[in-house]
C-alpha cells in the first residue's frame, strides 16, 4: 500500500507542475513550458495508472483530484500571486478534510 501512495504522490506533484506550466506556456505559445506540460501530465497519468494497482480507484482518484486541486491553488498563490478569498480557503479546508476522511481506515 505504501508504494501506491508513493506513486500517487508523484502523480499529484506531476499534475500540479503540469497545471502551473499550462499558465506559463501562454496558451502553448512558449515551447519549453508547453513541452513540460506534456511531460508532466504524461508522468501524472502513468503514475496514477500504477497507483491503481495498489489503491482502489475511488480512493486514488478522489485523493489525486482533491490534493492536486489544493496544491495547484497553493502554487497559484505562491508563484503567480493569485488571491485566495475566505470562500476559497474554506473550500480548500473542505477538500483536505474530505481527502483525510476518505483515507482514514
UniProtKB/Swiss-Prot annotation:
Residues annotated as transmembrane: 2-22, 35-55, 57-77, 84-104
Pfam families on file: Multi_Drug_Res
Annotated localization: Cell membrane
Keyword list, A-Z: Cell membrane, Membrane, Transmembrane, Transmembrane helix, Transport
Any GO MF annotation of the entry: transmembrane transporter activity
Major location category of this protein: membrane
Biological role stated in the UniProt entry: Part of a multidrug efflux pump. Confers resistance to cationic lipophilic dyes such as ethidium bromide, acriflavine, pyronine Y and safranin O. The efflux is probably coupled to an influx of protons.
Subunit comment: The efflux pump is composed of EbrA and EbrB.
Protein name (Swiss-Prot/TrEMBL): Multidrug resistance protein EbrA
Natural source organism: Bacillus atrophaeus
Lineage of origin: Bacteria, Bacillati, Bacillota, Bacilli, Bacillales
Amino acid at each position: 500500500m505504501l508504494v501506491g501512495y508513493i506513486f500517487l504522490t508523484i502523480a499529484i506533484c506531476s499534475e500540479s507542475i503540469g497545471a502551473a506550466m499550462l499558465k506559463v506556456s501562454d496558451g502553448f505559445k512558449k515551447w519549453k513550458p508547453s513541452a513540460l506540460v506534456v511531460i508532466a501530465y504524461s508522468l501524472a497519468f502513468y503514475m496514477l495508472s500504477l497507483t491503481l494497482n495498489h489503491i482502489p480507484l475511488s480512493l486514488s482518484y478522489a485523493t489525486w483530484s482533491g490534493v492536486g486541486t489544493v496544491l495547484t491553488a497553493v502554487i497559484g498563490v505562491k508563484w503567480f500571486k493569485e488571491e485566495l478569498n475566505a470562500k476559497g480557503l474554506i473550500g480548500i479546508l473542505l477538500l483536505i478534510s474530505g481527502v483525510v476522511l476518505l483515507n482514514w481506515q
